[in-house]
């Protein structure tokens, strides 16, 4: 009888990839980054094991949105107190914290459990084109 291959955490060889978000739609950048973080780009993908690689997203401030989402897309957060709902448009978030927009988009595409939190820790997002991970020799990911 044949059995399905299940990767073990010790078997995983992690790589580093750089994604340049300049001029690319937010959803496409987030989907590719989430795919790499989960490990779905490798043949040894196992759903319950973190088989993903590290991802560095550069130029997060130059990511684009299609349509009227620049003004219509809203981000919300709540303090937990009555009347504590805060809403921010995409435009104001882009002015204040553009890296947070990319992080939230990618985090929403990862599993919502402890494994997803572990995979999210392998994500690094930078506003400019410079990053501090040259020692890891990251490969450029084109899509």
From Swiss-Prot:
Swiss-Prot/TrEMBL keywords = Ribonucleoprotein, Ribosomal protein
Q: Which domain of life is it from?
A: Bacteria
One cellular component term (GO) for this entry is: cytosolic large ribosomal subunit
**PANTHER family with a match to the protein in the record:** LARGE RIBOSOMAL SUBUNIT PROTEIN UL13M, RIBOSOMAL PROTEIN L13
Q: How does it assemble?
A: Part of the 50S ribosomal subunit.
Protein task: This protein is one of the early assembly proteins of the 50S ribosomal subunit, although it is not seen to bind rRNA by itself. It is important during the early stages of 50S assembly.
Sequence similarity:
Belongs to the universal ribosomal protein uL13 family.
Q: State the name under which the record lists this protein.
A: Large ribosomal subunit protein uL13
Q: What is the lineage of its organism?
A: Bacteria, Bacillati, Bacillota, Clostridia, Eubacteriales
């Amino acid at each position: 009888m044949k059995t399905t291959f299940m990767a073990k955490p010790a078997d995983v060889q992690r790589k580093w990839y750089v994604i340049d978000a300049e001029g690319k739609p937010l959803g496409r950048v987030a989907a590719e980054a989430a795919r790499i973080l989960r490990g779905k780009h490798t043949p040894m993908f196992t759903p319950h094991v973190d088989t993903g690689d590290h991802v560095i997203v550069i130029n997060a401030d130059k990511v684009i949105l299609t349509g009227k989402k620049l003004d219509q897309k809203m981000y919300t957060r709540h303090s937990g107190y009555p009347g504590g709902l805060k809403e921010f448009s995409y435009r104001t978030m882009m002015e204040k914290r553009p890296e947070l927009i990319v992080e939230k988009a990618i985090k929403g595409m990862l599993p919502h459990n402890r494994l997803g939190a572990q995979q999210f820790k392998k994500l690094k997002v930078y506003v400019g084109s410079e990053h501090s991970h040259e020692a890891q020799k990251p490969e450029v990911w084109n899509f």
